[in-house]
Amino acid sequence: MADGEEPEKKRRRIEELLAEKMAVDGGCGDTGDWEGRWNHVKKFLERSGPFTHPDFEPSTESLQFLLDTCKVLVIGAGGLGCELLKNLALSGFRQIHVIDMDTIDVSNLNRQFLFRPKDIGRPKAEVAAEFLNDRVPNCNVVPHFNKIQDFNDTFYRQFHIIVCGLDSIIARRWINGMLISLLNYEDGVLDPSSIVPLIDGGTEGFKGNARVILPGMTACIECTLELYPPQVNFPMCTIASMPRLPEHCIEYVRMLQWPKEQPFGEGVPLDGDDPEHIQWIFQKSLERASQYNIRGVTYRLTQGVVKRIIPAVASTNAVVAAVCATEVFKIATSAYIPLNNYLVFNDVDGLYTYTFEAERKENCPACSQLPQNIQFSPSAKLQEVLDFLTNSASLQMKSPAITATLEGKNRTLYLQSVTSIEERTRPNLSKTLKELGLVDGQELAVADVTTPQTVLFKLHFTS
């Protein structure tokens, strides 16, 4: 897409490509539905109105596409995911897959309405699918009790639209990278049939957002990574010697006392879903809090700090899920112009919404298809490069593995996910880039948990 393309022409082109991708075949089979079941949907698809797409032609084919053909993947079956699944099933979408790696906890029941007390301990995806398949006639929800990383590109390519209700930025970035990897280019021109639209929703307390991402055409997750706040971490000196907040006491026990005392046996890791582990952290945190006259340590707060739980409000989930489901409907039917492309919701004080067009970043590490330029002195140590990859607001990598081609061989400079390799490559962190044999213009390949793709960086030496 040309950089100088006018916004209106750009919007029209996107709409045409979406309509082409969602084009449906004529003909419809017997759905077994009772008369009047889909009247509420037909009002949007079988007649025109002031808000319909200028090129939309009312017909029965769009509804049949939803009922018989359109395949939607919902990632996440938590507070937002339950709302999404319900909205999609009642809007005519019947071919729905859902992925969630979590099991149901008693704390979920107040807002995740597809679950009941008898379901505690069972996989969220499986219970949600069972509930909807039983409650909504002819609905076929297929559950996957897995991580999103467990599936390959063939799996994701089968869906017409993917919608996310995640509480993890890492997972968002990974699925963003996966959908970008599905894109096909012919002579530098994007093949629109390879685009799998991504609808992403997120909530925190009384705030939320929803966005429409057309990989390769509009701003992706990485283009706007700076919008996501970094995870709150407390300085170790404060935690150890000057605690002031109940969170400081909990973090002290989690980070220092647990590995030192190993209360459940040598090498047993802390499990945030194990009540006995949380109870131990809670009691030790109370003891430390009493030493510093700190109040406010509760079992719920302990669980929230250990599991990094994001505050959830049912009404916020309902609003954001409604927006996301509406965008799925608009894209699937091409009946209405989709959101362009980012919506913010806030009802902390009154009600506020705002929509704006997030712009693509020219040098986005995910969707620009360009190597990322980084500048360092030849005397800089590899540790400085590692710090840059993890601390940069536009990269925010978690455990980058750095490799380079030296003397015709692919060499791992540092990899921390495998203990034996980490121990072998750790000395490289204290070496300079020149000592490692890197030269000006050297390409570094970096792998990270935030993306299924390897990110290429071009190293430029500064004088």
From Swiss-Prot:
The gene is UBA3. This is NEDD8-activating enzyme E1 catalytic subunit. The lineage of its organism: Eukaryota, Metazoa, Chordata, Craniata, Vertebrata. Arg-211 acts as a selectivity gate, preventing misactivation of ubiquitin by this NEDD8-specific E1 complex. It comes from the Eukaryota. SUPFAM superfamilies: Activating enzymes of the ubiquitin-like proteins. Coiled coil: none annotated. It is an enzyme of class 6 (ligase). ATP binds at residues 100-124, 148-171.
